Design a protein with these regions (language model features):
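Long, solvent-exposed N-terminal ectodomains/accessory regions
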Residues: 31-112
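Catalytic-core segments of thiol-dependent peptidases
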Residues: 254-345
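Non-catalytic propeptide/linker segments at domain boundaries
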Residues: 106-262
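C-terminal motif of bacterial Sec signal peptides marking the signal peptidase cleavage site
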Residues: 20-22
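Bacterial signal peptide processing site
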Residues: 24-26
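Extracytoplasmic/secreted cell-surface and envelope-processing proteins
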Residues: 219-223, 290-291, 317-325, 347-351, ...
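Bacterial N-terminal signal peptides that target proteins for export
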Residues: 2-14
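Active-site-proximal C-terminal subdomain of hydrolase catalytic domains
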Residues: 337-437
């Protein structure tokens, strides 16, 4: 995700600086995914192609190579869903120098952020060899001309993220890369006009929200884009709850105007005019991947009854997204929406939570009946994060005039290319009775 701090350095330069933190390598294996897809900025496509990769290590070389699709597709305002890629016809052979050559057939789902210009085919230009030494050499040779123009501190651990092989001036020798021409088609999993399950959100008469904000820099105490985003969201809560018709309670009883690290756990709760209740808890952490046990315990208290869980901060190139998916406690039949608001989170979300929810709910074998994931196909600014979380909260509060996901997403910075998965089995339509009215 990007920061608007120090605008003098330029918007794209900060994107590079922010997204470079916390690189993660390959996506986790999973047998369950969140299913279909809806967005007001992107269309879901399937890219089918034959690939080839060489490596001196047997440890997931295909995964390592496909990571470079993140960078290339980001250059097209798009990104692929790595954990659900379908691989067939995988064949291994030895090269003359003792390395392993793997040929494979792949079908990659892509959130394509240019819905008005859908190509019939697309050429991936991926590194041929992904061994450690080969990636280091590839990075050293091409970390200036073949990366996003704002990238910096590029190394073999982040080259795949900034990789832009279609740049003017990017000269890649045929021996260095594999050019795979993908056939492109629309995915049958694209949906439109799907609503959140308002009848499930409000069946107990309460909307409970957890909004987590990660710092831009671990250990920061001030002058930090993540802390500023947290403070801005707290100010939004103060303003919105001041309009509540019922009594407003806060924890702590007195919340500073800029709570920051002095009050990293705040809650607003109020009764609405028709008897419904809204409760929003905002939390500030360094980063999810290294969060202390105190955060885990607090999250376990809040998560079972939460209707919306929004994480705003570094994706850590997938690390923080997957770390949050492994935390919390869940309740049978509890419908929940997760908003993973960080860099390219569509690429990094795996099936961990879907699998957990499927095991918890016998009537939900796919793990999507009681859960949706809202993710980004592109990065997001820290300064956009408070408004993005508020947009979804406001959408859920709009039960008198229900909003589709596409309508809700109009309140979010379009640069993020936000989308939802898991909504394909939603049944809510306007006019359906809610819980406590």
């Amino acid at each position: 995700m990007r920061s608007n701090a120090l605008l003098i350095q330029g918007r794209n330069l900060l994107l590079a600086a922010t997204c470079a933190v916390g690189c993660a390598s390959s996506a986790a294996d999973t047998d369950v995914d969140e299913g279909a897809f809806s967005s007001n900025e992107a269309v879901l496509l399937e890219f089918e192609f034959d690939g080839e990769v060489v490596s001196d290590s047997p440890w997931k070389p295909i995964d390592d190579q496909l990571l470079y699709t993140v960078g290339q597709l980001n250059g097209e305002r798009s990104v692929g869903r790595l954990d659900t890629v379908k691989l067939t016809n995988v064949e291994q052979s030895a090269t003359q120098n003792g390395e392993t050559r793997i040929r494979y057939h792949a079908v990659l789902q892509v959130a394509w952020g240019n819905p008005r210009t859908i190509p019939a085919s697309y050429t991936f230009v991926l590194p041929r060899s992904v061994g450690y030494a080969a990636q280091r050499s590839f990075t050293e040779q091409h970390k200036h001309e073949c990366v996003d123009w704002g990238a910096h501190d590029v190394d073999e651990g982040s080259m795949w993220y900034y990789y832009r092989p279609l740049n003017d001036g990017c000269a890649l020798a045929d021996a260095e890369v594999v050019k795979s021409v993908a056939t492109v088609r629309r995915s049958s999993e694209q949906t439109t006009d799907k609503y959140p399950e308002y009848q499930k959100i409000w069946e107990d008469g309460r909307l409970e929200v957890i909004a987590i904000f990660g710092k831009y820099k671990d250990g920061a105490t001030s002058n930090d884009a993540g802390i500023s985003a947290y403070n801005e969201f707290a100010d939004m809560l103060r303003t919105e709850f001041a309009r509540a018709k019922g009594t407003v309670t806060t924890t702590p009883a007195s919340i500073p105007r800029a709570p920051g690290i002095g009050a990293p756990d705040i809650t607003y709760e109020a009764a609405l005019g028709d008897g419904k209740v809204i409760k929003v808890t905002a939390l500030l952490v360094d980063n999810i991947g290294a969060a202390p046990e105190s955060f885990d315990r607090r999250y376990e208290v809040l998560s079972p009854t939460a209707d919306l869980i929004a994480y705003n901060g570094h994706a850590g190139l997938g690390q923080n997204v997957r770390a949050l998916a492994q935390k919390g406690r869940w309740k049978t039949g509890q419908y929940q929406v997760f908003f993973m608001n960080g860099c390219d989170t569509f690429a990094y979300v795996d099936g961990t939570l879907a699998g957990t929810r499927a095991a918890l709910n016998p009537d939900d074998p796919t793990g999507t009946k009681y859960m949706e994931f809202v993710t980004n196909a592109m990065p997001s600014f820290f300064t956009s994060m408070p408004e993005a979380s508020r947009a979804i909260v406001k959408g859920f509060l709009s039960y008198e005039q229900p909003m589709t996901y596409e309508q809700i997403f109009k309140g979010i910075d379009r640069a993020e290319v936000v989308l939802v998965t898991g909504e394909e089995d939603n049944v809510y339509r306007p006019g359906m009775p809610l819980g406590n009215r």
